[in-house]
Amino acid sequence: MSVLAETIKEGAREMGIVITEKQVRQFEEYYSLIIERNKSLNLTAITGEREVAVKHFLDSLTCLKAVPLEDGTSLMDVGTGAGFPGIPLKICRPSVRVKLVESAEKKAVFLREAIGRLGLEMAEAIWARAEDVGKDPDHREKYGCVVARAVAELAVLAEYCLPAAGVGGCFLAMKGPKAEEEAVRAKDAIKILGGRLEEIINLKLPFTGDRRSLVVIRKIGETPEKYPRRPGVPQKRPL
């Protein structure tokens, strides 16, 4: 058994996640593809099997602590990069419909290759800016859960993500130990965009004990038509 497979199995067990042999094989295939394409695409600075298993794959699966992702749930992953957390979540919840949004064309091409190589059905990579996706009627307020692992401030991520979440759905921001401080700064933005802070779940990654926070924001009203603002504005002038 590979180090990657062993780490994923043990970590998933510790997290209370049931994982099949097929899913473990998909994670191994995904890892191989990441390493294969990493030199040309700069997908990740972390390349060791155990590190990738913990800091990318298991870290992505922490989302299940906040949102169980029941059969048929529609999930959008904004600023997904190499596919985190969307692809690991899709592997473990194959019945979920997943859209992976990535603004870098080469990474979007990689995501399409990964979806094909792993045999993931009801999964699609979208090459676009988050601000444009949030305005698109095909995506606006269409998702049960919108997730982001990006490093932007929560107020910025809220403008990227909340417009795509349907009323009653949620926006899940994956953050580090300073999530509470960011939530305070993002309070007005969340309210303006139709959201309400529901909870902040603090947890630790298996094996490393690294601290993570999941910020759960419930969509309680429609996002005003003028949001998101044009590409680049949310980052320059957060709400």
Curated annotation (Swiss-Prot):
It is found in: Cytoplasm. Disulfide bonds: none annotated. One of its GO terms (cellular component) is cytosol. Gene3D superfamilies: Vaccinia Virus protein VP39. InterPro entries: rRNA_ssu_MeTfrase_G, SAM-dependent_MTases_sf. Its main location: cytoplasm. The keyword Phosphoprotein does not apply. It holds the Pfam family GidB. One of its GO terms (molecular function) is rRNA (guanine-N7-)-methyltransferase activity. S-adenosyl-L-methionine binds at G79, F84, A130, E131, R149. PANTHER family: S-ADENOSYL-L-METHIONINE-DEPENDENT METHYLTRANSFERASES SUPERFAMILY PROTEIN. Belongs to the methyltransferase superfamily. RNA methyltransferase RsmG family. Specifically methylates the N7 position of a guanine in 16S rRNA. This is Ribosomal RNA small subunit methyltransferase G. It comes from Pelotomaculum thermopropionicum (strain DSM 13744 / JCM 10971 / SI).
